[in-house]
Amino acid sequence: MRIIVCENYQSLSKKAAQIIGSQMILKPNSVLGLATGSTPIGMYKNLIKMYEEGLIDFSKITTFNLDEYYNLPAENNQSYHYFMYDNLFNHININKENVHIPNGMAQDIDNECLHYDKMIDNSSGIDIQVLGIGNNAHIGFNEPTINFNKGTHVVTLDESTRKANARFFSSLEEVPTKAITMGTGSIFKSKKILLLASGKNKAEAIYNTVHGKVTPEVPSSILQFHQDVILILDKEAAYLLSKDDYEVVQEVSKVK
């Protein structure tokens, strides 16, 4: 596990985009696993900027998103489908046929989950999977006590997760209670994993990810067993770690 600590969120976002961009240049038809939430927004802004400057090309890229709320239409402005188009896909030259997001409105939800994993396998697998992390160490929507072997599935959201996401809705009652998520078994198949974390509220989860016991109670702890994981943190998210744990990135870049 490689750990990179950046001065602030702007530097974290730039570093994450550089790693994704390097993967795209090295392999123009890369398969990217993408995440939602507030943490990767800065990375997406940097990727858009790199695209506009002609540094990267999305025309042959395939993407798979980690998760989507269950029973929330794609056109709802709080759906992850809407989020991804608003924050990335509408601003780049990606082929929309190569964009994959779980269908939260599927009539046969179990079949949708199986189909999603099959599409990932048929794509030759995810080259680099972007993850955020919850305060309770969830990755995707894999909540504590998750079965580590699970593929894509429907999950009942932890109350702490719903409260954390309530800021995006008018009230807690509007936050969906279920979601479709790639399971830790699906995530673990990715060739490389890039986990981003910003803020002191993520520090305990990060410490347990790196130094804690590998247990379903800490879903992200399974990453200790993956062959190629990079954690990109800002100083606040890293403050419980020892300086011997990580390398430091000094540069700061603001996205206008």
What is each residue range found by the language model?
Residues S30, S38-T39, M43, K118-P144:
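A glycine-rich beta-strand to alpha-helix segment
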Residues I56-I128, D245, Q250-K256:
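Ligand-binding beta-strand-loop-alpha-helix segment within the catalytic cores
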Residues G33-G37, N65, P102-N103, V130-I133, ...:
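Short beta-strand segments
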Residues K189-K256:
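ATP/nucleoside-binding phosphotransfer catalytic cores, i.e., glycine-rich phosphate-binding loops
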Residues M1-L32:
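N-terminal glycine-/serine-/threonine-rich phosphate-binding loop
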